[in-house]
């Protein structure tokens, strides 16, 4: 009996221990929940003092208050994500329906001029789509393991092998299609553009790819923030003000395996940092930099083309926080003598604190992308700090490695090797100028310098500015060496350094547009060259087409704080009766780095009246010509590099039948213009 009693006592003690081990749950009262919700709506992150006050008021432990707010924030984030997903799904369905309707309309469209059906290009794009989709079947074991070893310092093994990749040329992945019309940037449709691939990213990525990309992006962001926040000895001053990376200190701070498989003699490294204040709020700036179409419109002189291949993470709604995109970009210098640089990058945005964002770009080895320029982008990007007065402070870092497959032209060696061609200073200077331009675009009143009230309304002013921006974008594509335009190189660099390309005209079914460009050096400062070329009073001294007749400015729109940044409508005097209806639209601009543009196009009077009345200008035909001016980068200083480009229409000829007469015409036009500029400025002909 005693044994049995001992057994019962033992069982009861075990039961008590089990009861003690059970978790005790506490359900808050409706009053407590109501008070907590009220506080949460006012402040989602209460400090310790507020939590202690709530603890005393509601009779809860501070730890319970802390956990309640953590759980409530997680719950609200999940609700927002579900709402975002539903909204995106609805928008995707709407776009899909619109796409189907447009395709059906195109199938049954009839040309009003000839009555024939348009050429069906669906088969071409279907083929490209199939090639891109088939390229997803690749050997993930080797690729992912090598990338992980390079960026994360450890390989990833035991992955299921897939099919070998099918390489797709960058030409098939890029597109430079019509621009979109959005809040700040004007809609445009370049005459050099072609039917674009779908703007919505349609690349399917595995979860393993997404996880790897996220790890690489987070690591790159950490490196970028250290580069932004660290000064000497990591960064050293050159030329008194420019920040250049000390590569030895950098390699000691950041260790990684080589990207090029060993040191090569023709391998170059560029790393620079610059900062400035821009006239745009931080949220708007982040939105522009995270959108590939807006980015191309914002930097037409730098970004030749850009496309988002995949959205790994869309980020928080409204501010792009934690957004991660896989993108392809091609960067250019406005000259036929400098090859472009192509990158496949991960672009990651992170909100560092309230009013501060960081955006990082880092190269990613993607099988479908084969860079012809063999360029590599180390963690680069910018830090954007909102200044609460409509301005933002931007600090930019550019860090890249490139292989010179062909020697850089002697004329451009200094600006390329010193980082002036692709460096941070150029990005900041261009960003400041373009933000001023787009702010002026939104100004409700026309400029006080508008001569004679020719532009009658704010809508007319904005329409003219959009047309001018399309003109600038078209010119930048025509003089560069982008691989992603549908242009054909008719004649490479001849003995005068002139390159001629051709493409089909959007506005003339049987017409071809010839684009000729060359670069030359002048021993004169960029500011003086800019003042000479933009002044309508000196225009007859170099403009072959003006035939020496004087030119008058009939309308003027200011484009920024620099008085030289403006859009002008010019009219020639003593012109023949057939030219009375022809005017010239010109945009001139110069930034803090002394890089300048003077671009113009002839526009007939009826078309200009359409623009001045505020109507759509996307169908007005333009053939931009003009000049791109930059410092020569020489230590002696004072010289300028000028790229001149002309476009002419050739009717009734196919690309293979372009005759020598057309080639001679455009070559003579450039040679005569360059000769007259040098003669007027008292420069030797060999300069």
Swiss-Prot record:
GO terms for molecular function: DNA binding; DNA-binding transcription factor activity; DNA-binding transcription factor activity, RNA polymerase II-specific; lipid binding. It comes from Arabidopsis thaliana (Mouse-ear cress). Belongs to the HD-ZIP homeobox family. Class IV subfamily. Pfam families: Homeodomain, START. Disruption phenotype: No visible phenotype under normal growth conditions, but the double mutants hdg11 and hdg12 exhibit excess branching of trichomes. The double mutant pdf2-1 hdg12-2 exhibits abnormal flowers with sepaloid petals and carpelloid stamens in association with a reduced expression of APETALA 3 (AP3) in the epidermis and internal cell layers of developing flowers. Transmembrane segments: none annotated. Expressed in apical meristems and young epidermal tissue including trichomes and stipules. Expressed in lateral root tips, the L1 layer of apical inflorescence meristems and early flower primordia, carpel and stamen filament epidermis, stigma papillae, ovule primordia, nucellus and embryo. SUPFAM superfamilies: Bet v1-like, Homeodomain-like. This is Homeobox-leucine zipper protein HDG12. Interacts with BBM. Probable transcription factor that acts as a negative regulator of trichome branching in association with HDG11. Seems to promote cell differentiation. May regulate cell differentiation and proliferation during root and shoot meristem development. Acts as a positive regulator of SCL18/LAS expression. Involved, together with PDF2, in the regulation of flower organs development by promoting the expression of APETALA 3 (AP3) in the epidermis and internal cell layers of developing flowers. The keyword Transcription applies. Residues 206-440 form the START domain. Keywords: Coiled coil, DNA-binding, Homeobox, Nucleus, Transcription, Transcription regulation.
């Amino acid at each position: 009996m005693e044994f049995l009693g001992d057994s019962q006592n033992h069982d009861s003690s075990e039961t008590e221990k089990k009861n003690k081990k059970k978790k005790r749950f506490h359900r808050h009262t409706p009053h407590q929940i109501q008070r907590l919700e009220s506080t949460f709506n006012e402040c989602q992150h209460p400090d310790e003092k507020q939590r202690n006050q709530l603890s005393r008021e509601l009779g809860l432990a501070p730890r319970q208050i802390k956990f309640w707010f953590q759980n409530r924030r997680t719950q609200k984030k999940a609700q927002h994500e579900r709402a975002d997903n539903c909204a995106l799904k609805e928008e995707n369905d709407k776009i899909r329906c619109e796409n189907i309707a447009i395709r059906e309309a195109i199938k049954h469209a009839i040309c009003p001029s000839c009555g024939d059906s348009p050429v069906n290009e669906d088969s071409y794009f279907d083929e490209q789509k199939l090639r891109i989709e088939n390229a997803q079947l690749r050997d993930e074991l080797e690729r992912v393991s090598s990338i992980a070893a390079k960026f994360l310092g450890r390989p990833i093994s035991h992955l299921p092998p897939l099919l070998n990749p099918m390489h797709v040329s960058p030409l098939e992945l890029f597109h430079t299609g019509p621009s979109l019309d959005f809040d700040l940037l004007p809609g445009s449709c370049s005459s050099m553009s072609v039917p674009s691939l779908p703007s919505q990213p349609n690349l399917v990525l595995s979860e393993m790819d997404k996880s790897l990309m996220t790890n690489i992006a987070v690591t790159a962001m950490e490196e970028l923030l250290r580069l932004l926040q660290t000064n000497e000895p990591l960064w050293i001053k050159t030329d008194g003000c420019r920040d250049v990376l000390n590569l030895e200190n950098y390699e000691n701070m950041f260790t990684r395996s080589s990207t090029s498989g060993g040191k090569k003699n023709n391998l170059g490294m560029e790393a620079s940092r610059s900062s400035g204040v821009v006239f745009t709020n931080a949220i708007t700036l982040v939105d522009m930099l995270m959108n590939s179409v807006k980015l191309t419109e914002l930097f037409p002189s730098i970004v030749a083309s850009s496309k988002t291949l995949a959205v790994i993470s869309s980020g928080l709604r409204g501010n792009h926080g934690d957004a991660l995109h896989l993108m392809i970009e091609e960067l250019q210098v406005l000259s036929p003598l400098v090859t472009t640089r192509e990158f496949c990058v991960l672009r990651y945005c992170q909100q560092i604190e309230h009013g501060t964002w960081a955006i990082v770009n880092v190269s990613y080895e993607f099988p479908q992308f084969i860079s012809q320029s063999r360029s590599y982008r180390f963690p680069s990007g910018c830090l954007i700090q909102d200044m609460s007065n409509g301005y933002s402070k931007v600090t930019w870092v550019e860090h890249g490695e490139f292989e010179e497959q062909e020697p850089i032209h002697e004329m451009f060696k200094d600006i390329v090797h010193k980082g002036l061609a692709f460096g941070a200073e150029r990005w900041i200077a261009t960003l400041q100028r373009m933000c001023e331009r787009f702010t002026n675009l939104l100004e409700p009143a026309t400029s006080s310098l508008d001569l004679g009230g020719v532009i009658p309304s704010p809508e007319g002013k904005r329409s003219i500015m959009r047309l001018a921006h399309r003109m600038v974008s078209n010119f930048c594509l025509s003089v560069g060496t982008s691989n992603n335009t549908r242009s054909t190189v008719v004649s490479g660099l001849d003995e005068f350094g002139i390159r001629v390309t051709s493409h089909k005209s959007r506005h003339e079914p049987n017409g071809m547009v010839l684009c000729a460009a060359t670069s030359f050096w002048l021993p004169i400062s960029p500011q003086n060259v800019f003042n000479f070329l933009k002044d309508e009073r000196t225009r007859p001294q170099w403009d072959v087409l003006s035939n020496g007749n004087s030119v008058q400015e009939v309308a003027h729109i200011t484009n920024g704080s620099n008085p030289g940044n403006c859009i002008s409508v010019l009219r020639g005097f003593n012109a023949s009766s057939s030219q009375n209806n022809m005017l010239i639209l010109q945009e001139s601009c110069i930034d803090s780095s002394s890089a300048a543009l003077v671009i113009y196009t002839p526009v007939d009077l009826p078309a200009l009246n359409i623009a001045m009345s505020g109507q759509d200008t996307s169908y007005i035909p333009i053939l931009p010509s003009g000049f791109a001016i930059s410092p020569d980068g020489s230590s002696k200083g004072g010289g300028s590099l000028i790229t001149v480009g002309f476009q002419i229409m050739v009717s009734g000829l196919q690309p293979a039948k372009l005759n020598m007469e057309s080639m001679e015409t455009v070559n003579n036009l450039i040679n005569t213009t360059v000769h007259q500029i040098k003669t007027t400025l008292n420069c030797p002909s060999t300069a």
